[in-house]
Every structure is written in C-alpha cells, then in structure tokens.
C-alpha cells in the first residue's frame, strides 16, 4: 500500500523532528483511514500525546498498540515514558526491561515501589516464557541496587495471571511417592546454581496448584452430605497441623517442605498451625458427578508424532492405540499450524493461530490476553476439576495453562511410562469428581544427538556406520537431519508410548462406559528426521513431514469406526470439544468444527513459520495442491513481515518446492491467492519500520 507507506514515513519524519502540530494530526487521521488496523497509528498518537503532556492518554494508546503487537519496541518505549510521567515506576520498569533485554536499552532503575509484587513482575519481564517455575534472572534489591540472579519460584506464588476469582499457582515440588521434604531440601540448596538451571532441572518435577497461603487458622466449609478433597502445601519439614472436626477429637496432620498432600473432608473442618510457618490451602475439590458433564475428558499430546510417517504402519507400530481408537474417529489429513511446540500448544488450547495469540517467540515475557479463553478455563467453568499430571512448562508463564487447577511439570523429560502412571493415580484419587486432564508426552520427540543418551535397543542394534556420525554443531530439533539413529530412536519411543498409553486406555475402558468419557490423542507437529535432504541444504521446516500431525478421538458423541479424510487443523480441537462438552466457543476463533461432527469441511489448512529472524513461510494446503510462500526478508521481532517480492508457488501435494513441478493455472491462482492475502494481511507490515533496517 504505497499511500499508507508514504503517510507512515511522513509521520515518522515529523515525529523525529518533534513536529507535533495540527498538520501532524491531519496526517495521522489520513493514516488511520488508510491503515485502520495498524497499531502504528496508536504509537504515533501516543507520541503526540506525550508531546502534549498527556501521559494518561498516551498510555491508553500505547496499551492498544501493545495488545496488538506485544513485541513492539515502539510500543514499549511510549508505555515506559507514559508510566514514568504518571508516577507508575513499577509499570515503567516492566517496559524498560523489555527494551533492556531486546534493544540494549537502559536497565530499569531501582525505586521505592520495588516491593515483592513489583520485583516479581520485573522478574517476569526480564525472562522468557520457558521453564516455569525456573527463572534465570530474578530481580532483587541489594544495597539499594537492582540485581538479577538465577532462582526458582518455590514455596511461593508464581507470578502469572490467573482467571478472575481463581487462586494463584502456589509452587511446590512433586514428591512422587517418596518422602515429602526430600525434593524441598534439594531445591533449597540448588535453586541459585547455574548447573541446575542448565542441566539437572530437566527431570525435576514441580507441583503447581491453585492455592492461597495461610498463617494460623483456616476453616474449610463442606456442604452437608458432600465430601471434598483439600490440597495442602507445607513450608517446613514435618510441619504440624491440628485438624478439628465436629465429630472427632483433634488430630495431627504432617506436611512436607514445599510439597503437597491431600485430605478428604466430609464435614466442615478447622486447620490450625501453631507456629509462624505459613502453609498453602488449595481450592477444595467438591466430589460428585453431574449428568451435564462427562466423568473423564482426557487430552493426550504425543509431541512431534508425524502422522503421515506413522499412518501406513499404524496397526503394526501402535497396535494398542490403534485398537482403542478403531472405535472412534481418526483424522487422516490433519495439520499443525507451526513446526514446533511453543506456538502450537497455544493454538491447540485456544483454537487460534499464533498471530492471534501473539505467542510465537519463547523469549517474550507477555501472557495470553485475558479475553482469550483456554480449553481448561472453559472446562473449569463447566465444573470440571482440571489438571495436567505431566506437562512441559512451555505454556505456564505465557498463560496457556492458566485454567488448570494443578500442573505437574518438568522442563524436558516427559516419558509416557511416568505420565500414564500418574494419570491412573490421578483418576483413582480424584475420579469421584468430573475430570478434565491433559498429558504432554515426549517419547517420540527428536533431540540433538550430541549429548543425548539413546535407548539401549537403539545403541546396541545399529551398525557403527549409523550409530556414530560426524555432527559438530548443536541443532534445533526442527532442523535435525534424517540420520538412521534418529529414526531408530523414534521407533523405540513410539513402542514405549504405545505400550504405556495402551495400558492407560485399557484402564479407561474397564473403568468407564463409552458415554462417560472423551479421549483425544494428538500431536502438535511432525518431525524433520524423516525428510531426506542433501548435505548443506536447508530443511523444509513446514513440509508435510514437519507439520502433518495426528488426531484421533473416542467416546461420548464421537462417531465410531470413522477414518475421516477431510482437512483438519490443530486449532479445530477447541471447537470440537466445545461441541462435545457444551461450552460456547467464541465466534472469532480460527478453528472450525469438522464435518464429521456436523460442521463444514475446510477447503484449506494453514501451516506457517513466523520465527523472528527467519523468513516467514506459509504452506496453504488443499487435498490436492499446496501454495508455498516465503518472504525475502526475516520476520520482525514483533511478528510482522514484509511480503513485497515474496516467492510464491503452487504445487501438487507431495511435490512441494520440487523443481519443475510448480503449476500456474488461472483457477488455482483464483483459489489460493485471495485466501493467502487474507491470511497474512493482519501481520503484513508494509515495510513500515520505526527503526532503520540493516
């Protein structure tokens, strides 16, 4: 849009000269009309209002821009300036921290407002969104100086936003059948050690539960004739609680240091701690079933399962899972929106693409907008107890997992043997309530070979030529080559996953009838290790092997014995569960209800890479063809891209990017081009930049 482009750079020139006069307002009005959805107009308006000494108005405009582009330096700068002038030092420090981290700006200054809550917010601003409850740079005031050091949020609240009316996450360690305080002792000793953050944390389990901290006495009301399960978190080894009920003499309960225990209460109960140590009291879990709910809704994310690779061998490679879902619906043409987990998980949990969640960069610090309701929030509103007995922490700091009552996390190791065992224990413990549960399992996810211990059956069966290879650089999983050792590790992990998940599914069949449960098994993306490529060639990170995903369902309302050939996307799980479970899905989500459930078939699915610093890549697929697009220049940090001169081609499915196979027909262009333009329009930046480009 050449007209909007010229207006932008005219406004930028005036802004840099400080020419905030009536002509500036005329040009700004023209720019708003030319680009009504651009956040850049709000940034110019904020700059104007700052020049007119109206920081409150500037903050409003800046917030609008920030909500649309949470990684915009220009939005951070106007908000930092506005809040400084308003006297909101803590708010200003948050935006100054963003600029400090990403643009080498000035470090946030220490101020009298730096209380515990402000320091927690500042800590979040100085860190990315992975690895909760760990933090590489925790803010503290030492000798009136603001400092940052590695730490872990444990025995305290996690500084993340939760839904209105909900307790915050109080962080404990997960005892996992051992002694209550053992992991509390360990984490107290290593919480500030780099070696723990960089390595040993990978399989360390944390237990995050919605709870509030109490000192002294608390009374738990139990409705007459009902029972509740009460989570309790301790802060000291063998912490004593006096338990008082109307029908029994006083008794003692013992808690562990930073560890949760549970009590079943059948009448109103008073808990008393006579020392000064606080303890955490979770929200009581009211037992009982409702005919409006299912007894179990279970989502199983088998990370990085490429369905097109597995599908021809499904019954052979995954016999237990195949047998279970033969009585449900399997989607054969299912695609991820993204090539890796960080943007894909929010897409699944919200039914929205990454440019709508604004969760595409794990180094960012912001959270999912509160008006975007997650699956767990919706299920909680229906009355389910929501829990993830095993999950990565990828969606914790960014708000994707905020609707869960309980999260048991580990930063890296999420084996199905552990996850399915925890799931069965979870159902046994809390199954008198209606449950919504999520398992995130990593058995088949590929990892860089340089430091990885492969399965024994992989190491002992491969000949040396395949077991050993020259690979001298650390490589992201989405770019791993097609080495035989990676494929063998995948098969070994797949066998583990089928055996362990199969045991869980058999348990569910024995415990519930089909109209009492809904089980979904799916993946968030595929895998690059099945894509041959010449040495030195760039991988196709949004090719079918990397974005073809699994999705299968069984249970109440799910058609039996169906293998659906319609196109589906990972954003479609959200409206499907809305349909089956009875919660309202927002009208502006990107997901759609599949035809097999009474919806309309998609005419296309979209997979894309919007990783800042790399070119934007789009694969728009129908059943027979694919449009492939790649920009000339990288995606900006704020998630926008310049589509001028982008490379575009239309190919037969199965021959994407193959030389000599591009097609150029009028009907194909008429179908693909308008849809592709509509898809990228919201984040096309029209080459309008507040700062010069290299």
Feature names for model-found ranges:
Residues 2-13, 101-694:
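Catalytic domains that recognize anionic headgroups
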Residues 6-10, 40, 44, 78, ...:
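"A position-specific structural signal for the A-helix of alpha-solenoid helical repeats
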Residues 13-26, 50-62:
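Helix-turn-helix repeat elements of alpha-solenoid scaffolds
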Residues 25-29, 63-67, 97:
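Alpha-solenoid helical repeat scaffolds
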Residues 35-37, 70, 103-104:
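Short coil turns that delineate tetratricopeptide repeat
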């Amino acid at each position: 849009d050449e007209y909007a482009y010229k207006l932008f750079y005219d406004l930028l020139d005036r802004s840099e000269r400080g020419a905030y006069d009536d002509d500036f307002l005329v040009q700004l009005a023209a720019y708003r009309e030319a680009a009504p959805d651009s956040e850049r107009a709000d940034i110019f308006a904020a700059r104007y209002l700052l020049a007119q000494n109206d920081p409150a108005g500037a903050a409003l405009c800046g917030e609008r821009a920030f909500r649309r582009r949470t990684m915009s330096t220009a939005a951070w700068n106007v908000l930092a300036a506005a809040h400084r002038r308003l006297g909101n030092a803590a708010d200003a420090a948050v935006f100054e921290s963003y600029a400090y981290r990403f643009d080498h700006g000035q470090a946030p200054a220490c101020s009298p407002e730096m209380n515990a809550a402000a320091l927690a917010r500042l800590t979040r601003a100085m860190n990315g969104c992975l690895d909760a409850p760990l933090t590489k740079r925790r803010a503290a005031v030492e000798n009136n100086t603001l400092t940052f050091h590695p730490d872990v949020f444990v025995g305290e609240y996690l500084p993340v936003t939760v839904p209105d009316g909900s307790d915050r996450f109080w962080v404990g360690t997960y005892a996992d059948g051992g002694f209550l305080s053992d992991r509390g002792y360990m984490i107290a000793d290593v919480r500030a050690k780099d070696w723990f953050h960089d390595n040993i944390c990978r399989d360390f389990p944390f237990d995050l539960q919605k709870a509030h901290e109490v000192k002294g006495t608390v009374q738990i009301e139990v409705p007459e004739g009902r029972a509740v399960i009460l989570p309790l978190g301790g802060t000291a080894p063998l912490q004593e609680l006096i338990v008082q009920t109307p029908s029994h003499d006083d008794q003692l309960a013992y808690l562990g240091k930073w560890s949760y225990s549970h009590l079943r209460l059948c009448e109103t109960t008073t808990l008393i701690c006579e020392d000064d140590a606080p303890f955490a009291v979770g929200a009581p879990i009211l037992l009982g079933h409702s005919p409006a709910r299912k007894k179990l809704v279970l989502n199983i994310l088998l990370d990085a399962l490429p369905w097109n690779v597995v599908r021809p061998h499904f019954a052979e490679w995954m016999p237990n899972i195949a047998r279970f879902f033969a009585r449900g619906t399997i989607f054969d043409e299912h695609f991820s929106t993204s090539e890796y987990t960080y943007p894909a998980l929010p897409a699944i949990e919200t039914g929205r693409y990454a440019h709508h969640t604004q969760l595409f960069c794990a180094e960012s610090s912001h959270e999912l907008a509160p008006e975007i309701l997650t699956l767990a929030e919706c299920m909680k509103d229906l009355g389910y107890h929501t829990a993830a007995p095993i999950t990565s922490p990828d969606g914790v700091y960014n708000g994707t997992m905020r609707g869960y009552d309980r999260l048991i996390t580990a930063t890296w190791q999420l084996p199905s043997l552990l996850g399915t065992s925890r799931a069965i224990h979870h159902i046994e413990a809390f199954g008198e309530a209606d449950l919504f549960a999520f398992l995130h399992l990593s058995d088949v996810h590929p990892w860089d070979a340089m430091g990885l211990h492969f399965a024994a059956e992989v190491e002992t069966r491969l000949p040396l030529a395949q077991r050993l290879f020259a690979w001298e650089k650390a490589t992201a999983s989405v770019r791993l080559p097609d080495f035989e050792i990676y494929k063998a590790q995948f098969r070994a992990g797949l066998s583990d996953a089928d055996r362990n998940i199969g045991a869980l599914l058999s348990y569910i069949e024995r415990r519930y009838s089909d109209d009492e449960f809904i089980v979904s098994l799916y993946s968030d993306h595929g895998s690059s290790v099945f894509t041959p490529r010449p040495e030195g060639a760039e991988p196709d990170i949004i090719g079918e092997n990397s974005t073809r995903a699994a999705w299968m369902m069984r249970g109440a309302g799910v058609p039996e014995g169906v293998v659906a050939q319609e196109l589906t996307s990972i954003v479609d799980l959200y409206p499907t569960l809305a349909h089956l479970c009875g919660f309202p899905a927002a009208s502006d989500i990107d997901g759609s209800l599949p035809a097999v459930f009474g919806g309309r078939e998609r005419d296309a699915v979209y997979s894309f890479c919007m990783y800042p610093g790399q070119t934007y890549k789009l694969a728009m697929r129908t059943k027979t063809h694919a449009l492939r697009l790649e920009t000339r220049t990288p995606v900006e940090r704020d998630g926008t891209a310049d589509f001028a001169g982008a490379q575009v081609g239309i190919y037969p499915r199965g021959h994407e990017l193959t030389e000599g196979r591009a097609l150029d027909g009028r009907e194909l262009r008429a179908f693909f081009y308008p849809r592709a333009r509509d898809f990228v329009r919201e984040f096309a930046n029209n080459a309008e930049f507040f700062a010069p480009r290299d």
